[in-house]
Amino acid sequence: MQTQAVIEHITQWLKSYAEGARAKGFVVGVSGGIDSAVVSALAARTGLNTLLLEMPIRQKADQIDRAQLHIENLQQRFANVSGLRVDLTPTFEQFAATVDVNEADFPAKQLALANARSRLRMVTLYYYGQINGLLVTGTGNKVEDFGVGFFTKYGDGGVDISPIAGLLKTQIYTLAEALDVSESIRQATPTDGLWDTCLLYPSPSPRDQRGSRMP
């Protein structure tokens, strides 16, 4: 892979797409993971308004720290980048309490709640996208999202554009290094951020949920 050529191609594609859509820029959900770090760094390079949202829902401290540090880093490097923290934990907990059912009768409850987290974040991204005239920019890659379908319908799969949809996971790691994404993010164990120890089930890794290995 010609790394710099790929970076330039995606950056120009993003810019052209936004101009064609008459959008002012991009909004990206930043989780502290490798995919969102790469997408946000690519969006930042366009020079267009780039809003980075951190949307914790019972998130682990290390995930929050990585996301915040990544946003701060891009803000220091690019004048067009702004960051916002929207703590969705209270909203999610109120929703979970409102729709609560007996898990013995509804064994899919925990999975449904996990997917609800992703859908709540999607709603938040589109809210901020619409009031700011920004495109909701997806972080799905060729293998997980557009290969095996490892995403939440109308959740993280609900986006306007998907700039890394054609990239394999190994290629994303290569781009991350070239884009100066922090080593803490590049070395972090992949997670979808939809499960936690507050739920009955232990947090499954993407590998556990898909039955396949990450690079």
Regions flagged by a language model, labelled:
Residues S212-P215:
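Hydrophobic alpha-helical segments, chiefly the membrane-spanning helices
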Residues M1-F150:
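ATP-dependent adenylation/nucleotidyltransferase module used to activate substrates
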Residues Y201-D208:
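Conserved small/polar residues in nucleotide/adenosyl-binding loops
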Residues L113, L135-L200:
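Catalytic subdomain that performs nucleotidyl-dependent activation
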Residues I7-E8, Y173, R210:
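Generic structural signal for individual residues within well-ordered alpha-helical segments
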